[in-house]
Amino acid sequence: MRFIFFLSFPLYLLDRATKYLVLGHIKPDGPRVVVPNFFHLVNITNTGAAFGSFKNNNAFFIGISCIALLFALVLLLGQSKSGKAASLWWTRDIWRDVSLALLLAGVLGNLTDRLLYGHVIDFLLFDLHVPFAHPWPAFNVADACICIAVVCFIIHSFRQEKRVTEAAQL
């Protein structure tokens, strides 16, 4: 549990600090070029979810964020009644714990924005020069934490599947 706190809390603070700096130093109409034709720092308000989808649903996303936080905390603090791992969700390993720590940091970071400002502050803008995303939608540290959490949980699920398959072959 300490590991999760020591990963989540600094990432949450990094998200808050970077958004604070963006609000103080980057105007909404004045992007800062970091790497020409590739990376800019911007100040964009996002009232929706990923890629700006489902705009103007702040109350809905506050509710979803609270459910996600509760879900992650139950997984971190709970255990199956028998004390053994009953499913993929309860099976602890480093990938699951990292994914939950990142999820907590990301969800809490964006939830804080929604509660304080009524929207999420996005500021990292990459132009990947691909036709379907030119430029790639702006995002923030919390969004990156959530995306990496999903990847870590997928790795966790494949590792658990492999363990179940190996156990069945014995």
Mark where each language-model region is.
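Alpha-helical transmembrane bundles and membrane-interface segments of multipass inner-membrane proteins
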Residues: 1-170
